[in-house]
Amino acid sequence: MPWTFAHPAIVFPLKQSRYGRWLNLPALITGGVSPDLLYSSGMYRAADEAHHFTGWFYTGLPVCLAVLLIFHWLSVSLKTVLPFPVTDPLTCSLRKNSVILLSLFIGAATHIIWDAFTHETGTMVRALSVLQVSLLQGMTDGQEIAVYKVLQHLGSLLGTGYLCLKFAQYQRALPEAEKRGNLIRLIRLIALAVLGALCTAPLAYGLAQTETGVHINRFVFYELSLSISFFAGFVVLAALFQVIRKR
């Protein structure tokens, strides 16, 4: 999927299934986005390693643990800016922390398997010629649209739509006061995402330059991956600002 935050759509049905109820949802989500987070920090070689099962353990797993620690330290602050419940997943229980580690790996596995079918360097894309069939010819600089690329964008649209549906279902069950508060926080979050995208656009545009012009696929990749760092930073700053303002 070209959009990292569409990946958690896969883990929600898993968590709600008969066999996945005991898994930790925050860890599933963190693991589900972890292989792409290294792209957001410019660590492209490490990110490529994180898209393989063995490589994930020494690249993606440390990122997951860092994210969980950030949530552990800022869980109270983040509640003021996020339109959904924020829970601290870390505990003193060895059993529960073991479940967290397993959930991180399962979440990452869903990401790695999906990307195997939807990326040019994916294992299944290389193995199945049908995924390499070009559906749109004539684009310059080798920017053809193949089956795997269509699956990328279709997966993003369906995944994002599913997450929006789950959020709407969550909202309907809340009292009116909480609904209004969550709506305000959601609008602020969207504004921060737009701000992050605007800050990233000049950098992505420069990195996507080629001798023949702008490489569209490369621009989309840099824009969607690098904007996550700006967005995450803005969210943390907004959370800290809300806490300071209320003191």
Residue ranges and their predicted role:
Residues 1-247:
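N-terminal membrane-targeting hydrophobic helices
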